[in-house]
């Protein structure tokens, strides 16, 4: 069976022990306790996920992922993007570059403040017409889409936010400074809202979603 172009893996953040490389274990020792657990958990699940795609052991996956850096897969294993929130972890794998982001669907935050501080003039003008409940949902969606797009391209997230213009009609994001456009997908899955960004020349309607709730 031909593998799909895009697969995403979602799991709950139980922080159970996973298989990690010696290098990942060494890097984790330089992090705070919470950050170390989060790092080992996400990279361990990334190894597990890719191992199921490639039919190899998790420690054979050629993953290079220092803390704070975009993860890379060597040996033509494809592309990987990782995101986590308080309750879950999202791992995206594809044959092409991608960026992913995840957040709890009911996260409480100050939507008006985020809109006015981080979003473009065009977006503020468009979104300020909504009531608070609707506004919170759209501001959350835009944040997820923008962060996934940032992970696709790289750069500095906070400085890029106002340059990233979301177009809900054609499901694209324009970086008005770099004049680069990418596509996105956004959807709900269980307790989460998830976004995936990818290049304009890729046409995908639905990713294959894999969900894990096992204790390891």
Language-model region placement:
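Core catalytic alpha/beta fold that binds nucleotide/phospho-ligands
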Residues: 1-216
């Amino acid at each position: 069976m031909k593998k799909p172009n895009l697969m995403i893996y979602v799991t709950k953040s139980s922080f159970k022990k996973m298989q990690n490389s010696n290098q990942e274990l060494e890097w984790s020792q330089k992090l705070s306790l919470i950050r170390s657990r989060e790092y080992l958990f996400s990279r361990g699940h990334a190894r597990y996920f890719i191992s199921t795609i490639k039919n190899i052991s998790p420690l054979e996956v050629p993953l290079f992922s220092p803390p704070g850096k975009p993860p890379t897969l060597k040996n033509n294993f494809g592309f990987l993007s990782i995101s986590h929130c308080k309750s879950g972890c999202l791992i995206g794998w594809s044959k092409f570059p991608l960026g992913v982001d995840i957040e709890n669907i009911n996260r409480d935050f100050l939507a008006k403040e985020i809109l006015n501080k981080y979003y473009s003039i065009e977006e503020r003008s468009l979104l300020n017409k909504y009531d608070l409940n609707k506004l919170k949902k759209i501001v959350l969606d835009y944040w997820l889409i923008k962060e996934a797009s940032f992970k696709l391209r790289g750069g500095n997230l906070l400085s890029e936010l106002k340059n990233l213009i979301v177009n809900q009609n054609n499901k694209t994001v324009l970086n008005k400074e770099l004049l680069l456009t990418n596509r996105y997908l956004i959807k709900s899955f269980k307790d989460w809202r998830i976004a995936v960004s990818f290049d304009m020349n890729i046409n995908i309607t639905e990713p294959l979603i894999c969900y894990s709730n096992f204790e390891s």
